[in-house]
Regions:
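Accessory beta-strand-rich segments of carbohydrate-active enzymes
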Residues: 3-18, 40-41, 45-153, 183, ...
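An acidic-aromatic loop/edge-strand motif
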Residues: 7-9, 15, 26-40, 100-172, ...
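Extended substrate-binding grooves/exosites of carbohydrate-active enzymes
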Residues: 25-38, 118, 123, 129, ...
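Extended acidic/polar, glycine-enriched regions
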Residues: 102-108, 177-259, 611-612
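Compositionally biased low-complexity segments at domain edges in trafficked proteins
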Residues: 145-149, 153-170, 264-284, 640-672, ...
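Surface beta-strand/loop "capping" patches
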Residues: 149-183, 549-581
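C-terminal beta-sandwich/jelly-roll accessory domains of carbohydrate-active enzymes
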Residues: 214, 218, 222-225, 576-667
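Compact, charge-rich alpha-helical regulatory domains located at protein termini
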Residues: 661-740, 744
Length: 745
């Protein structure tokens, strides 16, 4: 029988280049748990060598095989046993295995896994707005199987493929196929289907060289986000009254559609997908999360009331997909084809390989409904080869899985009539109107215009959001002040925009949790992207979390916002309450001060007494309370110093421009720099680069320098392109161009 032995203990990690001393570690492990998010501006990208010993397990009968199973190695790995290479792997997010039987000997065997998170021209991701953690961050197993066993060699897959389909009579068919290695005529495969209570509801037997079968289950329980009913399909490899190997898959019976006018429906029920995106890291753990960590994340998202998760920007842990199956989420799963296109043909083959692994390894998960081809891949510009690669990926996915839909996350400035459309089945845009560019009020009109002009495209929003730092507060929140209040205000608006448009097939807030991004330094917090509805340590739910809970949760809730804005000045102050109940009653120091009937957001203007005040909100059977202190002046530490500095910097920029006519048509004289030159080209001239980087800093608060941080992601962009994506003051891009065209190439 199959035996799975964890090899997570007793590893030695060394660094051949000597960056760090040798240490003893336990898996899951990453060497970037701290420097990947501590704000120092860089993190260790190198090769680490993990070493331990193991004793080869023995099968009762001769001919048994031993496999090393690596659940993920970021980003590339070489597996050796006793100094001999067993396998290599490029791609940091998927399972891979190696048959090491013939490399083992009696007694202790040395297992070495060389792992690198360095960039290569042949592998994705190239550059992106998150930390590329290095290490064996999901664990390693030893698998012992008889000589005849279910497949372990095909793209890290489970060896079994199940396709449930509901039937018109209320039942369901289960198309099942498994693959047997070294099969012989005497072996058969026994299939059994059990419902969620453990009752067998169907079974079948097939010869091991022709394992495909269709089984019927009457009165099938459907899987949906509200009722995630699971069936367990077990395959047993048998001969002479003996089971030699056994595998299983948890599956769900469901059907779903997406149309441009009706959006998403599951099992015939219109159900707009509203949820979040998620990265797989946590404070000072990096991406080395345990099964418990993954389940906790899924539970927090369920508590939010979301029904969909975009798992960005790579394959996630089986533990998390299992949680999504169990708890009920519609999942968008994708590969790290992101931000920067690599023209090396081997890079496209790596894309194909990662997509194949993603689908083969995760085909049985009922929660997965969409395969994502790429994310913001036009950041570095467009070329025919890039478009062709997307068509090729679409064809590949269709061949591997004709049962699911494909999708794509367009960068905000992707032309609405360009060649990147009509490749995937459904599409989404990453839009940050109200943060990087434009105003939050533009989101609804943009969707309406796109829908009217492209009535044949199923459109969604794959990213949207703002940074929210729980230290910063304001009574007059503004874009780029990084306050918790502006983040909440933004999400109040967007939540209503999406509720008013059920034809938007899916929306995914960016992001559920703050996450590591070593290159960032924004809002006074370095090393992280702070757009999460919760903090990176999972300790604090920002007010924006409760905006969505009020809109999405079916459980009664009420939440008073602004509890960290605890000191208030002025004759009156606004008390904002989020609730999914129709009416909220507010009490201040035990006295009723107001009752409102509203939709999700309730605002009360109240007078506070000197000193501390108890605020109580009651909505039906649910209550919430906070304490506020009335003060003469609110503390200066509520305001991010950089916010005022940035405003002053923009003002000084225009002062230095002087009397230039910023309304005149822009000129682009030959032989001189302009906003049409890429950052990489501008970097060839010290003066031009200084101008451009200062402009980027003022407009985005990003510090970019050649070879540092997000330079690789942004170097192909032009200031002209950036201006279409980010919110620049009127005349700003014109003034930059007017200064650049004075500099000769």
């Amino acid at each position: 029988m199959r035996e799975i032995i964890s090899l997570n203990e007793n590893w030695t990690l060394s660094f051949p280049k000597g960056e760090r001393p040798t240490e003893q570690v336990t898996l899951p492990h990453t060497w970037n748990a701290v420097d990947g998010m501590d704000g120092n501006g860089s993190y260790l990208r190198t090769t680490g060598v993990y070493t331990r010993t193991f004793t080869q397990p023995k099968q009762p009968l001769a001919g048994g095989r031993t496999y090393v199973e690596v659940l993920a190695a970021a980003l590339a790995a070489t597996v050796k046993v006793n100094g001999q290479v067993a396998t290599t792997h490029e791609g940091g997010f998927s399972i891979f295995r190696a048959d090491v039987t013939d490399l083992c000997h009696e007694g202790d065997n040395e297992l070495t896994i060389e792992v690198s998170n360095e960039d290569t021209p042949s592998m994705y991701p190239a550059s992106a707005d998150f930390t590329f953690y290095g290490g064996l961050y999901r664990g390693v197993n030893l698998i012992s199987v008889p000589g005849t066993h279910f497949d372990l060699d095909y793209f890290g897959g489970p060896g079994i493929k199940v396709t449930p389909k509901p039937t018109e009579d209320g039942g369901a068919t289960f198309e099942i196929e498994s693959w047997v290695t070294n099969g012989e005529e005497a072996y058969t495969v026994m299939y059994s289907i059990e419902d969620c209570y453990g009752n067998e509801v169907a079974s079948g037997v097939r010869p091991c060289d022709s394992t495909k079968v269709t089984l019927y289950v009457p009165d099938a329980q459907l899987w949906s986000m509200d009722e995630p009913n699971l069936y367990t399909v077990t395959a047993r490899l048998q001969k002479n009254n003996e089971t030699f190997d056994e595998i299983y898959a948890n599956v769900g019976v469901r059907s779903y559609t997406v149309t441009p006018n009706d959006g998403f429906s599951i099992n015939g029920v219109p159900t707009p997908l509203r949820g979040v995106a998620r990265h797989q890291d946590c404070l000072y753990k990096g991406n080395a999360l345990t099964a418990e960590d993954h389940y906790e994340d899924a539970m927090l998202i369920k508590e939010l009331g979301a029904n969909t998760i975009r798992l960005a920007h790579y394959q996630h842990s089986q533990d998390f997909y299992d949680a999504c199956d169990e708890l009920g989420f519609a999942v968008w799963a994708e590969i790290p084809f992101i931000s920067v296109f690599k023209k090396d043909p081997s890079a496209h083959q790596n894309c194909r390989h990662q997509m194949t692994e993603l689908i083969i390894q995760n085909y049985n998960h009922p929660s997965i409904m969409f395969w994502g081809l790429s994310n913001e891949i036009l950041i570095g510009g467009i070329c025919q080869e890039l478009v062709d690669n997307h068509h090729d990926l679409q064809k590949l996915v269709r061949e591997l899985d004709p049962t699911r839909l494909t999708t794509i996350a367009h960068v905000s400035n992707t032309p609405v009539d360009g060649p990147m459309h009509h490749i995937t089945d459904v599409e989404s845009y990453n839009h940050y109107f109200g943060w990087y560019g434009g105003k939050m009020e533009q989101n609804g009109p943009w969707l309406d215009k796109f829908h009217a002009e492209h009535p044949d495209i199923c459109i969604g929003i794959s990213e949207y959001g703002t940074e929210g730092i729980i230290n910063w507060h304001s009574n007059d929140p503004q874009c780029k002040d990084y306050t918790e209040e502006y983040q909440a205000l933004y999400h109040e608006h967007l939540a209503q925009v999406f509720e008013d448009r059920p034809w938007v097939w899916a929306t995914h807030c960016w992001n559920m949790f703050d996450f590591g991004c070593a290159a960032r330094h924004e809002g006074g917090v370095a090393g992280r992207n702070n757009k999460g509805l919760m903090t990176i340590d999972r300790k604090t739910k920002k007010d924006s979390y409760f905006v969505y809970q009020a809109y999405w949760s079916k459980l009664p809730m009420v939440h008073i916002a602004g509890r960290r804005h605890a000191q208030r000045a002025g004759e009156t102050t606004e008390i904002k309450v989020y609730s999914n109940q129709d009416t909220v009653v507010l009490y201040v120091n035990g006295k009723e001060v107001g009752q409102q009937t509203a939709h999700r957001v309730f605002k009360f203007n109240v007078a506070l007494e000197e000193g501390f005040n108890t605020i109580l909100a009651v909505a039906g059977d649910v209550k919430d309370s906070i304490t506020l202190e009335k003060v003469e002046k609110e503390p200066d530490y509520y305001t991010l110093p950089e916010f005022n500095e940035r405003q002053e910097g923009v003002a000084n920029w225009f002062k230095q421009v002087g009397s230039l006519d910023l309304k005149a048509p822009m000129e682009f004289p030959e032989g001189y720099y302009s906003i049409k030159d890429s950052m990489e080209d501008l970097s060839k001239n010290e003066e031009a680069l200084a101008l451009a980087t200062r402009a980027v800093k003022l407009a985005t608060n990003f510090d970019i320098k050649p070879g540092v941080g997000m330079w690789d992601m942004m170097k192909r962009m032009t200031p002209e392109t950036m201006a279409k994506m980010i919110n620049m003051p009127d005349g700003f891009i014109e003034s930059l161009n007017a200064q650049l065209i004075k500099i000769k190439k």
